[in-house]
C-alpha cells in the first residue's frame, strides 16, 4: 500500500463515512485470561463512545510506511491452503459475525502477545467501502463506484490503571476519590486484506506497530506465519554495521556527514514531490555515494557484500529508516553535540597535540545554561 491508499482508508473512520455496524473485541488481563467480551452496535452507542472506538481503530493505520506500517506478504502456498490465511479470510467473509471464528482469532493473539504485566483490549471491526472511481485529475467521482472493498481492521490497546484523584459526583453533589482503567493508544494492529491499487489484495496485510524498534514478531508469527521485514531500528543498525565493518578507518566524520546529507536530500526531495510510494534506496545507490566520496573500490565491494549478508540480495532500503533526517548528532563518552541537519558541516574533527577534538565555530552569541558568555581573549 502507498500513502494515498492508507490516507483514503483512514478517512473512512468517521461517523458519517464508515459502514461499520458493530464493534467486537475482548478485554484480557495480565494472566492472559479473557475478562469480558465486547459486542456493541455502533447504531445505539452514544456518539462520543462510538467516536472513541473509531479513533482507536484509525490509529492502526497511522504512522510512517516502512516504519510503523509494515507490509505482510503471504506466499502463494499460504493463500492456496493454510490455516492462518483461512482464518483471516473467514473473519472477513463472515463479517465478524461468527463467534467461534472470533474466539479462535482472539486466542492466537492471547497465546502469542507479550505485553508484560499489562492488561489489554483487542478490538475488531468489519467495513465495506464502495471504492469510487477517480477521474483524470485524480479526483473522486462520488457518483461512480468501481467495486466494494471489504476488510477487517484490528488493534490491540493496553489498558492502564489511572491514579486515584478527586472527582465530582453530581448525584451526591460532593467530591470523592475515584480511579479506574483507561484504554491507551494501540500498541499494534493490522488491516486485512491490503488495499493495493485501490482494490483488495488477499496476498498482503498491513501491520501496525506503535514502536518502530519492537514490531512484535511473536504476533506476526502466530497470526500470519511469516517473517516481517526488518524493523526501522534493525535496518539502521544493520546499515551502520555494514559501513563500519567494510570501511574500517575510512568510515570517518566527513564520510558519515556526506552520507547523512545525501540521504537527507533524497528524503526532502521525496517529500516535496508528494510521491505516494515509499522512497527506496538500492545498495548500488548507497555504493555510488561512497564512490563519490573517494572510497576505494575494494571497500565498496566489501560494503556491498556486507549489505547482501545483512539485508539479502537485491534488497531496497528506506533512507528514512537509516538516518534521523531531523538532526545531526555527534556523541562522545561524556558529551553530545546536536545541530540542525542543514548545519552538519559546522562540526569538524581535528587532532591537536595528539588529542582528538570536535570543533564548532562560535562566531555568534554563546549561551551557557541560559547565560550569555564571552570567549576569553575576545
PLM regions and their residue ranges:
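Long, hydrophobic alpha/beta structural blocks
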Residues: 11-17, 21-324
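C-terminal, beta-strand-rich globular interaction domains
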Residues: 277, 286-378
